[in-house]
Amino acid sequence: MAKAAMLKIKLLSTADTGYFYVTKKNARTKTEKLSFKKYDPVVRKHVEFKETKIK
């Protein structure tokens, strides 16, 4: 069986609220860690979300 190209990752808020998004990325083409500015409803602002592993 072939190795899956798409990995599930967790985007964790840098505002230390514990809020996160779950998304997928192609591990073969995107080798660097993802970083997005997304909405954090806990602080009610757009903040940076960085990639972490799902435990």
From Swiss-Prot:
One of its GO terms (biological process) is translation. Belongs to the bacterial ribosomal protein bL33 family. It holds the Pfam family Ribosomal_L33. Signal peptide: none annotated. One of its GO terms (molecular function) is structural constituent of ribosome. Keywords: Ribonucleoprotein, Ribosomal protein. One of its GO terms (cellular component) is cytosolic large ribosomal subunit. It comes from Methylocella silvestris (strain DSM 15510 / CIP 108128 / LMG 27833 / NCIMB 13906 / BL2). The keyword Ribonucleoprotein applies. PROSITE patterns: RIBOSOMAL_L33. InterPro entries: Ribosomal_bL33, Ribosomal_bL33_CS, Ribosomal_bL33_sf, Ribosomal_zn-bd. This is Large ribosomal subunit protein bL33.
